[in-house]
Amino acid sequence: MESQQLSNYSPISHGSACASVTSKEVHTNQDPLDVSASKTEECEKASTKANSQQTTTPASSAVPENPHHASPQPASVPPPQNGPYPQQCMMTQNQANPSGWSFYGHPSMIPYTPYQMSPMYFPPGPQSQFPQYPSSVGTPLSTPSPESGNTFTDSSSADSDMTSTKKYVRPPPMLTSPNDFPNWVKTYIKFLQNSNLGGIIPTVNGKPVRQITDDELTFLYNTFQIFAPSQFLPTWVKDILSVDYTDIMKILSKSIEKMQSDTQEANDIVTLANLQYNGSTPADAFETKVTNIIDRLNNNGIHINNKVACQLIMRGLSGEYKFLRYTRHRHLNMTVAELFLDIHAIYEEQQGSRNSKPNYRRNLSDEKNDSRSYTNTTKPKVIARNPQKTNNSKSKTARAHNVSTSNNSPSTDNDSISKSTTEPIQLNNKHDLHLGQELTESTVNHTNHSDDELPGHLLLDSGASRTLIRSAHHIHSASSNPDINVVDAQKRNIPINAIGDLQFHFQDNTKTSIKVLHTPNIAYDLLSLNELAAVDITACFTKNVLERSDGTVLAPIVQYGDFYWVSKRYLLPSNISVPTINNVHTSESTRKYPYPFIHRMLAHANAQTIRYSLKNNTITYFNESDVDWSSAIDYQCPDCLIGKSTKHRHIKGSRLKYQNSYEPFQYLHTDIFGPVHNLPKSAPSYFISFTDETTKFRWVYPLHDRREDSILDVFTTILAFIKNQFQASVLVIQMDRGSEYTNRTLHKFLEKNGITPCYTTTADSRAHGVAERLNRTLLDDCRTQLQCSGLPNHLWFSAIEFSTIVRNSLASPKSKKSASQHAGLAGLDISTLLPFGQPVIVNDHNPNSKIHPRGIPGYALHPSRNSYGYIIYLPSLKKTVDTTNYVILQGKESRLDQFNYDALTFDEDLNRLTASYHSFIASNEIQESNDLNIESDHDFQSDIELHPEQPRNVLSKAVSPTDSTPPSTHTEDSKPISEINLRAPREVDPNISESNILPSKKRSSTPQISNIESTGSGGMHKLNVPLLAPMSQSNTHESSHASKSKDFRHSDSYSNNETNHTNVPISSTGGTNNKTVPQISDQETEKRIIHRSPSIDASPPENNSSHNIVPIKTPTTVSEQNTEESIIADLPLPDPPPEPPTELSDSFKELPPINSRQTNSSLGGIGDSNAYTTINSKKRSLEDNETEIKVSRDTWNTKNMRSLEPPRSKKRIHLIAAVKAVKSIKPIRTTLRYDEAITYNKDIKEKEKYIEAYHKEVNQLLKMKTWDTDRYYDRKEIDPKRVINSMFIFNKKRDGTHKARFVARGDIQHPDTYDTGMQSNTVHHYALMTSLSLALDNNYYITQLDISSAYLYADIKEELYIRPPPHLGMNDKLIRLKKSHYGLKQSGANWYETIKSYLIKQCGMEEVRGWSCVFKNSQVTICLFVDDMILFSKDLNANKKIITTLKKQYDTKIINLGESDNEIQYDILGLEIKYQRGKYMKLGMENSLTEKIPKLNVPLNPKGRKLSAPGQPGLYIDQDELEIDEDEYKEKVHEMQKLIGLASYVGYKFRFDLLYYINTLAQHILFPSRQVLDMTYELIQFMWDTRDKQLIWHKNKPTEPDNKLVAISDASYGNQPYYKSQIGNIYLLNGKVIGGKSTKASLTCTSTTEAEIHAISESVPLLNNLSHLVQELNKKPITKGLLTDSKSTISIIISNNEEKFRNRFFGTKAMRLRDEVSGNHLHVCYIETKKNIADVMTKPLPIKTFKLLTNKWIH
């Protein structure tokens, strides 16, 4: 007989009590709360547990042997330890007892055992009142039998057992605490029962079974006093004893009453916590049971509020009541009464359903989740829930059942259930099947119900294309083994067992059938909304019902969890029996390997692959049968779901049923395309499209940008158009999540107009397929139309609009109508339509004169939107017009003939189509009307106008680049077209050139011209002009160079023919003209064809000059000529090679195409002096970009798994057009934060050094009185804009010292807190280099100083506050600054003014005008860089005097005094300098580069072959648009900033040979393509290989009386994008290179001479400033020189003929340069190109040339 253990119960342990409650059997004639009977054995167990030093064995048990008691604990179980009582007071026969005392007259009944002695036991004294047993009772008491019907035996029954075996009675433990009294009473009652005094114990009603005798009362009183000391009694016990100290019976009665009450409360709490309800019992009974429990607990002082009660009730709901958990859990103020109203409603609905449909009545036992037993007459299912107990509860398997054949009788009763035979299954966990559930309709599902599944319901799925069900109970007309392939969301195949019909019987008594697939391998029964829609049933989630299109409600929808469900009670059952699919778990499966274990072991492969591998023995050691495959089908690996997650498959047509309710023009789709690059500013770069969901009518609008106001204007326009034209209001607009749609301006506009924006979901671009497919279609049409017509790309939107007009009139295969017909508009009249690009002649209604031709050739674009005319493009006027005054040009020489349009376009058919339209025009034409020929103000193309050109007789006609393709010629049958002299009425767009105006046959970049033909007004005539054919651009660099070399070697093609000349047909716009072009010499050809401008000077070409450096012979004196020779004499120029290469004129330098796919911004440089080509036009030919309209994005790189979804890429384009030089390079962060240096620094030694530096910095700040230490301010009291954040930064210097600096966050300083006019000045690098050079030549001493905490010497005027250092622990306080703290905007300027004033007033220095931070007096020169000072003087004592003066005011530290005559090493502003006074100076950065470059994470090759040059000629930077996701783009830009930042720092310090490469790559920082990164890596690799190189200076000859300052300049003409030229300058002082500059010219030069002039003019200002500095620092005379390798430039500078400048648009710059040269006494000298060391600044050079030009000054 099971019983609860009362000794373990306490009021504060309800949770454990609830968890350990088991079912009990109680005799019907016994009170279950009767402590005197049913709890006696538990009291004994509690007493046993209380004895911490005592074990109980069968031989020494204190309980008399009785077969009705619980079985003793096995010997293997260890004895109880550490009970609640610390001692046992055992009375034994060996103790000396007082006379007359006996334990009920039988002291021998307690045998002595050694382990029963307690060290705390003491024998009672004689004065102790021991219990006396009455003389009338002389036999021991025995335990009553449960069969007696009474819990306790009376005296007579005790007498009958006097002869029983002697047993000792264990006394109760000693009471040691008032809190232990309830447990002690239980053991005390047990003691009385074992002493045969159970009859005197009060029962439930408080009265004993028999009267207590006086002797028993004495015994009771004495034992209570002995084992319950008064100091440990509870208060209520003491109160009873204070009234009557002998009333022990009242204490026992009260204790039993309390125990009964506590037990009842515990049982109620346990019952309430384990409520179970599934509708199997009436709802009224369930409500009565729950309310009684709650009322009883409230009456006993345990208050259960509504929230807790509702949670407990809902937790126990199952079956169809389970969904109340999710529908009610959000109601915060729900009451128990409201919850039971819902339960009653569901119960009544169930009963009504069962009564109305007896054939589909679910067995009541299906949902008995609270049933714990199952009776099966044939073969019961035994499930071991506890090793010591068995339970006949029935479970369900996790993934498998043996489904028995169901007869599906109209009524299902318990008899039919008991007859079903099933195999034993094992219960895996408590969440499997509902306990007590039978194998009826609901259990044929061969998978578990998921935790979020609503049993007995179908899941509504809008993404599923087919309905799938796990049960065969509802499949009608099933056919097995269907050939159907079904995949799930992870694209895994789902095996299908059968296909059939699913029949519904809805509320309106209508029946509907859909197709259904049977499979046990799914987690839910899925009902496809697509299949329901096919039978005119839709789901309305607003009303949560299934309904027909006419609004008839069929069934309710239940929202359970995150899904929507429909009850299965609307399904009609069938009589089909499907065979078992999955095997039932047997005991054998426990010996197999679980599939999840194998799945994880084999790298998370799928089950199909693993099984196939095991079958084919590719995996050894175990076989397929060794794996438990029962859970393989439905097993969902959480790691696989995360690691292999894919985008949801967008189901085509899944949205249509939700949009059918919209009327025309109420639901729009929109998307934006763009930008299209390389277009004139007047042409649109974007377009926005709109598509109506219902009619599929389309609109397109041009856009020049994607600004908010531009988008808003378009939305305003189309909404007004739809409202006025179609009397409709737009309700919803679907769009993507681009910033142009998600901005606040548009959102407010839509909200104001009551329009709902519908955005696409993340990573589901296919949901926006309507708009994106339209854009793709229009772009395909655009490319095709432009290719077909040959029109320039800036007319791309006209092609888009033409396509939109046509496609709105084409019928859809689905709707059988066109979009225009759906919209109620008229169809397209094809008689008014012309092919896109059709050549036409437009009437000129306003000619220049009456004899001027009245026809202008043009190309038809599309019908006008604003008139009945046509939009026609006029190339000659560079604009479009809206007119009806045109005639179709039917000549065979039109552009449309290039693709053999003889077979595609027929003039007769075109005439027949347009005959009616033109007859209509002719009949209504007004002769003098000009209205129809006026430009349309609404057509954007009318704003496109181009450069006006001079009237020309020659229009180059492009031909095929291959020699095998003969040029097209016109036969005699060709109809002549009169020549038209055109005018340009207004200024034109500068971005459009001729090649982008007229149609071209092939979109070749630089076509090779083999012959030129043209029609003239007087017939055919050939001209013998030695044209230089431009080379076709090859796909590879090698072929390109080969082509150039080959064409150049054929010099005979460039020779002139003085006596014979042929007639070359020249292309014209119309007519023929027999004109003989006169003979043209080579020089004239060069002027006309190549330069198209006369040369300013007649100087000989450079390739005919001598290889020696020859100054220009001018009418100067001999001394001046000697000066020019002396300028060149000491320069570090290379020695000339024995056989110099032949150079050609600068005129032959190639002009690269502007839109080439390979930009001429390269490390190879197309502007190389060794690369030559020619052009055949006065204006440069601009190449059409073949991929301007290209919008397809590359496939996402599958290796890039940094994101779980394909990244949203952005197109990156070159931004180098606006970049002139390296600017704002982001520096490399070499400092550490506080957490990096101290908090999380694992290097203990380094951490200690940083802590030491930290305290040193704080002490220095306090010493300098940086802030006011007298008061700390509360943050709330200070204006927030005057509060500056602060932080600590840590750094390790190259000398190994660790430094800490407490700085203010000046980067976020408010502008009102400092004077923006103040500047922080530092010494210019050119000033430092000049000072160092003069020091070497004059044997100066160089002293290096450092002023500690320099900024803190400057006071601060403004009222500013910062946060205290962290160690002070005052986070909410502020301190006021008194000094110019580090990091503040004004600190640098304040320090500069402070130290400047001190040097001038106290040290007697003066600042050099124009060169801040350079101070001098008669003996000393000082260069100041913040807190670093460099002193130069002839006398070291002069330096020491300055140092002494500085130390009076500042903490000055001498870094290097420089007094040694040996080599001295300095580290001055990053430069590592080796200086031996009077001999040499070497400047480098080897140590710094050795430390910094490896930290850049550049793939260096330290042991490989070293690079000999930073780049090679012929390497082009690809200009393809770069598509890259945002994170990777930022990462690469940051990497480029670090690499170019370091390279720029080194290059401008001393590595001037790298400046061209640095400048070129710096222009591509925002375009970090793979090619750009590789070139950058190559530059860094070269810096690493040559990190030991130094800038070498030697002392100037002492015989030189003057200082010589020289600037060598060079320019590379047109080798940068957009024909910009690269210019470079190198500055030398007394033969020592002190600086260099390489940059892109700010202006576009038109010739090599102009580029050279630009380069020289850029060098003159700095040359003059340096001259002033040198003269200030050294009083010697100075000679200034300019060296260039362009004789034509020198000729211009020294020329006195001003007439040559009047016709040159660069004449102003040339005149200014001439004036500067003359006014500043500059000597302009010529230097050969092979000796021009500035050549390294303008272009990449071959290795040999690069070494030759640099090895004299840097090595």
UniProtKB/Swiss-Prot annotation:
Please report the stretch or stretches of sequence annotated as the Reverse transcriptase Ty1/copia-type domain.
1338-1476
Site feature: Cleavage: H401, N402, N582, N583, A1217, A1218
Predominant subcellular localization, coarse grouping: cytoplasm
Q: Name one GO biological process term.
A: DNA integration
Q: What positions are modified (Phosphoserine)?
A: S416
- Disulfide-bonded cysteine pairs: these are none
Record note on modification: Initially, virus-like particles (VLPs) are composed of the structural unprocessed proteins Gag and Gag-Pol, and also contain the host initiator methionine tRNA (tRNA(i)-Met) which serves as a primer for minus-strand DNA synthesis, and a dimer of genomic Ty RNA. Processing of the polyproteins occurs within the particle and proceeds by an ordered pathway, called maturation. First, the protease (PR) is released by autocatalytic cleavage of the Gag-Pol polyprotein yielding capsid protein p45 and a Pol-p154 precursor protein.
The question of whether Nucleotidyltransferase is a record keyword is answered with yes
Q: Compositional bias of type Basic and acidic residues: which residue ranges?
A: 1038-1052
Could you name the active-site residues? D461 (for protease activity)
> Where along the sequence does the record place the motif called Bipartite nuclear localization signal?
1178-1212
GO cellular component assignments: cytoplasm; nucleus
Q: Where is it located?
A: Cytoplasm; Nucleus
Question: Which positions fall inside the RNase H Ty1/copia-type domain?
Answer: 1610-1752
| Positions of the Integrase catalytic domain | 660-829
The UniProt regions of compositional bias labelled Low complexity, in chain numbering, are 153-165, 402-418, 960-969
Q: What InterPro entries does the database record attribute to this sequence? A: Aspartic_peptidase_AS (IPR001969), DNA/RNA_pol_sf (IPR043502), Integrase_cat-core (IPR001584), Retrotran_Ty1/copia-like (IPR039537), RNaseH-like_sf (IPR012337), RNaseH_sf (IPR036397), RVT_2 (IPR013103), TYA (IPR015820)
Entry EC no(s) = 3.4.23.-, 2.7.7.49, 2.7.7.7, 3.1.26.4
KW Ribosomal protein (keyword) present: no
Highest taxon in the source lineage: Eukaryota
Q: Which residues of this UniProt protein bind Mg(2+) 2?
A: D1346, D1427, D1428
Additional remark text: Retrotransposons are mobile genetic entities that are able to replicate via an RNA intermediate and a reverse transcription step. In contrast to retroviruses, retrotransposons are non-infectious, lack an envelope and remain intracellular. Ty1 retrotransposons belong to the copia elements (pseudoviridae).
Q: Give the protein's function.
A: Capsid protein (CA) is the structural component of the virus-like particle (VLP), forming the shell that encapsulates the retrotransposons dimeric RNA genome. The particles are assembled from trimer-clustered units and there are holes in the capsid shells that allow for the diffusion of macromolecules. CA also has nucleocapsid-like chaperone activity, promoting primer tRNA(i)-Met annealing to the multipartite primer-binding site (PBS), dimerization of Ty1 RNA and initiation of reverse transcription. The aspartyl protease (PR) mediates the proteolytic cleavages of the Gag and Gag-Pol polyproteins after assembly of the VLP.
* Protein name per the record: Transposon Ty1-PR3 Gag-Pol polyprotein
